[in-house]
Amino acid sequence: NGNEIVHDYFYARIWAVPAGIMLFGFNGWDTGMQNAVIPMCIAVTVNIVHVSTSLWLVFGHGMGITGIAYGSVVAQNTGVLLAVLLLILRYRKILTRFTWREVVDWEPVRKFFLINRDIIVRTLCIVAVYTFFTAASARMEDPILLTVNTLLLQIFTLFSYMNDGFAYAAEALTGRFIGARDEQSLRRCLGRCLGWGTLISVLFVGIYLIWWRDLLGIFIKAGTPDAAQVVSTAGNYIVWIILIPLASAMPFIMDGIMVGATETKVMRNSMLLSTVAYFGIFYSLYPVIGNNALWLAFTLYMFLRGTLQLLMTRRLRLIYRKAAA
């Protein structure tokens, strides 16, 4: 049943969490060093390993959705190994300049966590939203619906990884141009990042609209008893997967801009408001429209994240002002 599927997926997927957290650290380091190539290589490798391993476990060993979870575990840990290797190769000279006494000096560590308090709150909100999405799907006590929601969310993840690249670029370049007091370059950079993010969103709308059945077919073994029912049920909700890229065009880029400009309070506040709206919309509309309420809440949650940040910075004027100071 649905609860057993969630149980198996959770207790397999949880082993990827430590590696996932480590990758955040490595990507942050590389981005801060103005190096977007290494995070890109890591992200591409993680995705290739995730897809190939998941396909092998699902179709080669018949592990179903648990195979996808173990694919995530293998992919995340592969990403960590690659991150360590690239860090040593690229920054070997820098790494020889620190002492372990600096690493275990708790006063700087305490300040570090205070500075990153807003980012931690944002991360907790993201975890809460995605965890609740899976939990709410399971509580509907319909294995087909749980499978559909999980697969459609995986399809959306393909888009999120693409836009993450522009978010990292916006993060690194925003910090660079603000530090250099180069307002003109900052305006040009942010305009291009937002433009490319929108273009990628429109591209994925077309991809999902035309090839959503083929994308689902990657995760569903043809000829299985429930395959046709899963595809048929997914068709009832595919409109959300088409709309979500449009709603998500801005939040990924805006997050990068806020981190690069150290305006993390704006990011935190917009995330808190969006998360409250997410739960409010779901609980208000679920008795009326059922599973559609979950997808509507998620779509508006993504839309609000970007829109609120844009409004709170007065359409980025506050960010540009930092570069002009």
Positions of predicted regions on the chain:
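Transmembrane helix-bundle signature of multi-pass secondary active exporters and lipid flippases
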Residues: 13-20, 110-177, 197-205, 238-248, ...
